[in-house]
Amino acid sequence: MISATKIRSCLAACVLAAFGATGALADKATIPSESPFAAAEVADGAIVVDIAKMKYETPELHVKVGDTVTWINREAMPHNVHFVAGVLGEAALKGPMMKKEQAYSLTFTEAGTYDYHCTPHPFMRGKVVVE
């Protein structure tokens, strides 16, 4: 008789093989600044995702390889950008908490689809599609 543990292990291996586990986002993006910075420092024409009313205002964003995306928190509640990877949703990159009118940027260096959420508010979800 096959144990439940062996069945679960085999199932997990099959799922990972079928969908492929992605590497850490740190290998696919660069972080211009580890810390949040003032929203006033964001250049005109920048690709921006505003965070307001407990949501990412642009829940799905399409950009090109090499583009920098900046998230700006427009409300008093602190938020962050927490990317996940793989079919099990393991952490790939967790941005810092941003206070009101603070920003955080990532430059995407590899094509792919990158799902993210706010750590303290997991119902806040977004996606960056890099083409």
Curated annotation (Swiss-Prot):
Alphabetized UniProt keyword annotations: Copper, Electron transport, Metal-binding, Periplasm, Signal, Transport
Q: Which residues bind Cu cation?
A: H79, C118, H121, M124
Q: Name one Pfam family in it.
A: Copper-bind
Name its pathway. One-carbon metabolism; methylamine degradation
So which cofactors does this thing need?
A: Cu cation
Q: InterPro entries in the record, alphabetically?
A: Amicyanin, Amicyanin/Pseudoazurin, Amicyanin_Para/Methyl, BlueCu_1, BlueCu_1_BS, Copper_blue_Plastocyanin, Cupredoxin, ET_Amicyanin
User: In this protein, which residues make up the domain named Plastocyanin-like?
Assistant: 27-131
Q: Which Gene3D superfamilies match?
A: Cupredoxins - blue copper proteins (2.60.40.420)
Output the Gene Ontology terms for molecular function: copper ion binding; electron transfer activity
Q: What does this protein do?
A: Primary acceptor of electrons from methylamine dehydrogenase. Passes those electrons on either a soluble cytochrome c or to pseudoazurin.
Q: Where in the cell is it found?
A: Periplasm
Cite a GO CC annotation.
periplasmic space
This protein is called: Amicyanin
Q: What CDD domains does UniProt report for this protein, alphabetically? A: Amicyanin
Q: What is its main location?
A: periplasm
Q: Bound how, and how many: what does the cofactor note say?
A: Binds 1 copper ion per subunit.
